[in-house]
Amino acid sequence: MIIAIRGPLYVSQIIFLFFPHPFSNFVSKYQIMSVATSRTGTENARISINQEKCTACGLCVKVCKDFSLIIEDNILKINQKPLFGCIGCGHCVAVCPHDAIAVNGRTLNPEDFSKLEKDNLPDYESINQLLLNRRSTRDFKDKPVQQEIIDKILAMASTAPMGLPPSDVGVMVLNSKEKVKQFSFDFIDLLERMKWMVSPASLTLMRPFMRKDDYLLFKSFVIPMVSFFTESRKRDENYLLYDAPLAMMFYGNMSDPADPYIAATYATLAAESLGLGACMIGSVGPFLKNTGKDFKRKYGLPSKMRDSIIVIFGYPQVKFSKTIKRSFERVYYV
């Protein structure tokens, strides 16, 4: 049996794997509460049913994997013994053909739902062409990115899948070339103070305690990178964020570690569709997980950050005329 679970794995999930629904004996002994996020704690979303509109078609019951909804005597009811309690995924509202269900709480309200437009969806070839056109852009025109464009990028990135709603991803926006440069140099100054941690001497001392791949990563990439950043900073050159006119840092707190990266990926695709170039910068986040208290305070970042990544944006100086065929390390079927 192969089990893949997005989001944190909680004890109640493990129990459910081995004691699938119904598990009334379990829930009768233990209080069921919704899975925690940094934004909502363990608050449950609240489901309401308009019985005058409901036809008990069962679609909402089918899509609710929390078992928060049940049909009894041909009447849709709220289950008093769900798996976790409503997490506010909104599937029941989105699937109901009669607008008979509403969900409030965990940042959701009825105004957040809107009708899908299915007549203007891009086909495979259109999406594939967008993806093939995308390149990592590090050379930008000296031109600011308008607020309207920034808002569109953020709106599209906010639709990214998440391990558990509501999203725990935060976004720090640096919306000018000057702010991006100041952030870069502040971070490089932090690296300068931490340089002893990634020096050849330190690496030699740590070698017996490191995995081979980690050792090679530090030796071949991290140490030369830190040295290059600090030396170029002395020449007033920004090779960290390349003097981009716009940068966004996507970070997570309690969230699934993948969430910031998925949102950042959506942001790069939004930028491509809007005529911007973008590039993911992964060299900042790892250093801020357990250090940089004053730096994080200055930029409004949480003191306890998990995974994070920066995306730089701008109008590209260079236009590419070819795409590149990429491949996975391997693909196999089992």
Please provide the spans of the model-predicted regions:
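Acidic, surface-exposed loops and disordered segments
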Residues: 4-9, 18-334
